[in-house]
UniProtKB/Swiss-Prot annotation:
Interacts (via heparan sulfate) with PTN; this interaction promotes neurite outgrowth through binding of PTN with chondroitin sulfate of proteoglycans, thereby releasing PTPRS of chondroitin sulfate proteoglycans (CSPGs) and leading to binding with heparan sulfate of GPC2. Interacts (heparan sulfate chain) with MDK; this interaction is inhibited by heparin followed by chondroitin sulfate E; this interaction induces GPC2 clustering through heparan sulfate chain; this interaction induces neuronal cell adhesion and neurite outgrowth. Keywords: Cell membrane, Glycoprotein, GPI-anchor, Heparan sulfate, Lipoprotein, Membrane, Proteoglycan, Secreted, Signal. It is found in: Cell membrane. Belongs to the glypican family. Nervous system. The lineage of its organism: Eukaryota, Metazoa, Chordata, Craniata, Vertebrata. It comes from the Eukaryota. The keyword Glycoprotein applies. This is Glypican-2. The gene is Gpc2. Residues 361-379 have a biased composition (Basic and acidic residues).
Length: 579
């Protein structure tokens, strides 16, 4: 027995012992066959992958233990890990980008088509009512709609000037036609324009129609423009956030997560879910848009509700022709009072010789009656879209993406390439250094909370992310201001269009049945000399119209240099004895 004992002591080290426990280091794997099979399927050259483990002293990111990776293989795996992660993020965000882009396109097409429908409807109404009188001078109305389109599509400025110039053009043609027996030199028309621009508003030739039209059009266009711009800004910000280059710390963490198991020779060992969540939260913290994202979505929904309610774009577009006609009727019905005040302030013009008086309009054009807009069919877009449906679709789509940024790490780690399945959470997994269980806490939340992330350093400032959040915050502020009737893009915001609430101040303009609250009077506009176009103005050579003390860009002045025209009401022709 004593002779056998030394022999047993020599054979004991060769006997297999118990394997490592669930919480121990990875099992010793001497073969790289599994790694060669996986990387060979990806197109890696097998000449770069040894058949068995080699010393890992050359590794820069993975544990410097026995490895299946050369330095070149490790660098390629770093790039592959980044591509995989980036692809998952962009695929997850593709629905969000598509949602914002599609809503932007639909709302933009709707608003533009509603303006076209309004212009076409006005042309049909006025052509039916006034015939050749309208067709000869339709350019003034085309100029009005050109100015409205320029504000919505291009400049974002000059809306007040566009509307005020339209009414001024109309007045400079209307007053001489009400008194064809007189000659009106440029100085007289300049005095007339000055009277209508006084702060006390004592002379309102078109009654309250200019103010009411201005309120409806301004609020609706400001809200529509802010909504479309907000959708476009959101789309651009999200698209940029999903495609920004990754920081070096994120690239290294991703390599430890899904690349190092291949180098260790255990590609089938899935990363621990907590490990993946920490890496994903750390990498995405510099891309996420919280908390600005929630406020941005609230701003979109608030403004969309206002556009189908108190700031109805459909109602504002439909009311253009109605408000203009009401203004002309007011001028006709109060012509005696208006003329008396004008003659008192500006003097009595010289009479025109009878042979120089304008010929009356044809009888058939003056006998047509005005037809109220209530008799017209409600306009719809070519696709049959209405604002109510667009807002419902927007609300439904945005409800799906409200928690997008907060849930993006969970979505990414739900992919089978990134982490173990939830059903295998109790099984050993890849911890970053070997087989075991991931014991570090999962850090979620804001960028400040990510400072405690155990997997990567997020303390370095991220200027691009801050810039994107500022863009989103600015778009939100613009939309919330537009929901209050304010245009932040206008340097000289007008009190009539600003309001202090959600539009209830001017409920009479929105068919709400409440009495209007008259806003403060506008400051006086600079006087305008009359234009020289030879239409209905006698006794003066005229002068070019100018805009004193006002600045505007090209987009807001497109429709402001058209010849002035006037649509004479049939009943007014009758009263003037021209039939």
């Amino acid at each position: 027995m004593s002779a056998v004992r030394p022999l047993l002591l020599l054979l004991l080290p060769l006997c297999p012992g118990p394997g490592p426990g669930h919480g121990s280091e990875a099992k010793v794997v001497r073969s790289c066959a599994e790694t060669r099979q996986v990387l060979g399927a990806r197109g890696y050259s097998l000449n770069l992958i040894p058949p068995s483990l080699i010393s890992g002293e050359h590794l820069q990111i993975c544990p410097q233990e026995y490895t299946c990776c050369s330095s070149e293989t490790e660098q390629k795996l770093i790039r592959d890990a980044e591509v995989t992660f980036r692809g998952l993020v962009e695929d997850s965000g593709s629905f969000l980008i598509h949602t914002l882009a599609a809503r932007h396109r639909k709302f933009n097409e709707f608003f533009r088509e509603m303006l076209s429908i309004s212009q076409h409807s006005l042309a049909q109404l006025f052509s039916h009512s006034y015939g050749r009188l309208y067709s000869q001078h339709a350019v003034i109305f085309n100029s009005l709609f050109s100015g409205l389109r320029d504000y919505y599509e291009k400049s974002g400025e000059g809306l007040d000037d566009t509307l005020a110039d339209f009414w001024a053009q109309l007045l400079e043609r209307a007053f001489p036609l009400l008194h064809p027996q007189y000659s009106f030199p440029p100085d007289f028309l300049l005095c007339l324009t000055r009277l209508t621009s006084t702060a006390d508003g004592s002379l309102q030739p078109f009654g309250d129609s200019p103010r009411r039209l201005r309120l409806q059009i301004t609020r609706a266009l400001v809200a529509a423009r802010a909504l479309v711009q907000g959708l476009e800004t959101g789309r651009n910000v999200v698209s940029e956030a999903l495609k920004v280059p990754m920081l070096e710390g994120c690239r290294q963490a991703l390599m430890r997560l899904i690349g190092c198991p291949l180098c260790r020779g255990v590609p089938s060992l899935m990363p621990c879910r907590g490990f993946c969540l920490n890496v994903a939260h750390g990498c995405l913290s510099s891309r996420g848009l919280e908390p600005e994202w929630g406020g941005y979505l609230d701003g979109l929904l608030l403004l969309a509700e206002k556009l189908q309610g108190p700031f109805s774009f459909e109602l504002a577009a439909e009311s253009i022709g109605v408000k203009i006609s009401e203004g002309l009727m007011h001028l006709q019905e109060n012509s005696v009072k208006v003329s008396a005040k004008v003659f008192q302030e500006c003097g009595t013009p010289h009479p025109v010789q009878s042979r120089n008086r304008r010929a009356p309009a044809p009888r058939e054009e003056t006998s047509r009656s005005w037809r109220s807009s209530a008799e017209e069919e409600r306009p719809t877009t070519a696709a049959g879209t209405n604002l109510h449906r667009l807002v419902w679709e927007l609300r439904e789509r945005l409800s799906r993406v409200r928690g997008f940024w907060a849930g993006l790490p969970v979505t990414v780690c739900g992919d089978s390439r990134m982490a173990a399945d939830l059903s295998q959470e109790a099984a050993p997994c890849w911890t970053g250094v070997g087989r075991g269980r991931y014991m570090s806490p999962v850090v979620v939340g804001s960028l400040n909370e990510q400072l405690h992330n155990p997997e990567l350093d997020t303390s370095s400032p991220d200027v691009p992310t801050r810039r994107r959040r500022l863009h989103l915050r600015a778009a939100t502020a613009r939309m919330k201001a537009a929901a209050l009737g304010q245009d932040l893009d206008m340097h000289d915001a007008d009190e009539d269009a600003s309001g202090s609430g959600g539009g209830q101040q001017y409920a009479d303009d929105w068919k709400a049945g409440a009495a209007p609250v008259v806003p403060p009077a506008r400051p006086p506009r600079p006087p305008r000399p009359p234009r020289r176009d030879g239409l209905g103005v006698r006794g003066g050579s005229g002068s070019a119209r100018y805009n004193q003390g006002r600045s505007r860009n090209l987009g807001s002045s497109v429709g402001l240099h058209a010849p002035r025209v006037f649509i004479l009401l049939p009943s007014a022709l009758t009263l003037l004895g021209l039939r």
